[in-house]
């Protein structure tokens, strides 16, 4: 297994009128981000440990923690809600620009933070003094989020005129001037707060891991349009509100699809009749609604696909609401993931519940926590994703899930699967020769969820 190590900047910033707590030193934030063993306030590990574990050692982020950078403006200047919209920080573009310029003044060379040589700074993360609006902070607090400077400048979240994005009536960019430091463009970024909830306790890793998930290409699984939905995964998923489990100290493991999307696991296809063993932290499975085998397009397939995994209350999953077999239903849409709206207009990423309820009612406390997984408290022993497939005799013993898989479609009794797992191709015409070059997964910046997958030539 080849380990990919990414290097990014974590800028710790203070406002003109608000400073870090004296006990929250740069060293303490470096430990939170990078320590091999991080247990402060009951933490299960550091941000680095979390992503090492999610990738089974294939990916290790390292953060150069810089600061504190003292920003020229007050917290309220950057963070006050624009036109009364909660979470829409009025001058967030200026916040990012000032944080990056301040880091440069401390000696940071941004040319060292473009590992994929695409001209953009990688892994821009800002941790700001005080509270965040998302977990009880005032409307003048910045809402922890991930975004990009093109959008922030286009929507006018700035008070200066040096940097801008202009579009025509069709919404196409006709001119822009993005911040460039040491020859590298500041484009995508993420940020979160120093203090958790309304207390004065130092932040935990949960929200940082959530926002860093956006940097890697993951989308929010709650509804980002501000409306309520009881079909979102809730505390069962880091990218919903699982980042708050154990006061943010123990975010849950990523779902099997998210690991698949990032190139860290490859689920087996459920196609052939027989008994299936599903151990925790072991094999995972997926199922397509097809009666014949076609090339597998990987996590970017636009089919409705079901994913099956065994999740037990240990390690990063210690504080999950329950345990057993989780069934995820995913309908991938590149545009919806790119714009961070997979569950807004319709539910494209959902957790199927054993008793037919909604995961939202089984969240952080109360509710019937074992209603979600199979077999669960309702002892649900059967599930039929499609008319021609069924899972029967679902059982759990000693943390291992077993079931009998039946597929009545005769054309796939003995399938052969041509796996094109998550592959993206660069196609170039060189004279009379067509050159096709495959690239790897998006954690190294080679492609994003917006990229098309080659289907046929």
Regions found by a protein language model. Give the residues of each.
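Low-complexity, Pro/Thr/Ser/Gly/Ala-rich linker/spacer regions in secreted
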Residues: 1-4, 405-421
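Active-site-proximal beta-strand/loop segments in catalytic clefts of secreted hydrolases
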Residues: 11-16, 127-131, 218-219, 241-244, ...
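Acidic, glycine-anchored loop motifs typical of Ca2+
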Residues: 110-123, 297-300
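C-terminal outer-membrane/trafficking sorting elements
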Residues: 416-457
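Post-HExxH zinc-binding segment in Zn-dependent metallohydrolases
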Residues: 231-268
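Non-catalytic C-terminal accessory/binding modules of secreted extracellular proteins
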Residues: 21-61, 65, 69, 136-198, ...
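Active-site recognition of the HExxH zinc-binding catalytic motif
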Residues: 126, 206-221, 308
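Fold-level signature of zinc-dependent metallopeptidase catalytic domains
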Residues: 1-32, 82
């Amino acid at each position: 297994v080849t380990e990919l190590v990414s290097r990014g900047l974590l800028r710790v910033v203070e406002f003109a009128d608000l400073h870090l707590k004296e006990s929250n030193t740069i060293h303490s934030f470096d430990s939170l981000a990078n320590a091999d063993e991080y247990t402060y306030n009951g933490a299960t590990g550091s941000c680095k440990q979390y992503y090492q574990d999610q990738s089974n050692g294939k990916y290790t982020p390292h953060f150069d923690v810089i600061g504190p950078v003292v920003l020229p403006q007050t917290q309220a200047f950057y963070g006050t809600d624009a036109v009364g919209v909660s979470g829409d920080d009025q001058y967030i573009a200026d916040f990012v620009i000032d944080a990056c310029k301040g880091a440069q003044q401390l000696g940071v060379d941004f040319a060292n933070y473009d590992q994929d040589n695409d001209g953009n700074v990688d892994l821009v993360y800002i941790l700001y003094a005080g509270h965040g609006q998302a977990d009880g902070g005032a409307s003048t607090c910045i809402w922890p989020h991930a975004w990009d400077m093109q959008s922030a400048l286009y929507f006018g979240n700035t008070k200066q005129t040096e940097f801008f994005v202009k579009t025509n009536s069709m919404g196409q960019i006709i001119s822009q001037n993005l911040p460039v430091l040491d020859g590298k463009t500041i484009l995508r970024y993420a940020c979160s707060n120093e203090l958790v909830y309304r207390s004065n306790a130092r932040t935990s890793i949960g929200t940082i891991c959530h926002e860093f998930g956006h940097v890697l290409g993951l989308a929010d699984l709650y509804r980002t349009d501000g409306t309520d939905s009881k079909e979102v995964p809730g505390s069962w998923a880091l990218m919903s509100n699982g980042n708050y489990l154990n006061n943010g100290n123990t975010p849950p493991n990523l779902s099997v699809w998210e690991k698949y999307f990032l190139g860290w696991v490859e689920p087996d296809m459920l196609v052939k009749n027989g008994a299936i063993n599903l151990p925790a932290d072991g094999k995972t499975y997926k199922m397509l609604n097809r009666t014949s085998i076609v090339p597998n397009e990987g996590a970017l397939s636009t089919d409705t696909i079901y994913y099956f995994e065994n999740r037990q209350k240990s390690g990063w999953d210690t504080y999950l609401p329950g345990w057993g077999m989780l069934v995820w239903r995913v309908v991938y849409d590149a545009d919806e993931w790119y714009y961070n709206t997979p569950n807004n207009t319709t539910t494209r990423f959902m957790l199927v519940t054993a008793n037919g309820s909604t995961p939202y009612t089984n969240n952080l406390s109360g509710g019937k926590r074992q209603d979600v997984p199979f077999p669960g408290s309702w002892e649900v022993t059967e599930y039929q994703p499609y008319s021609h497939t069924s899972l029967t005799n679902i059982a759990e013993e000693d943390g291992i899930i077993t079931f009998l898989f039946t597929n009545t479609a005769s054309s796939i009794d003995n399938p052969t699967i041509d796996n094109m797992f998550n592959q993206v191709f660069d196609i170039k015409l060189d004279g009379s020769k067509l050159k096709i070059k495959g690239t790897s997964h998006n954690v190294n910046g080679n492609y994003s969820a917006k990229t098309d997958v080659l289907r046929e030539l």
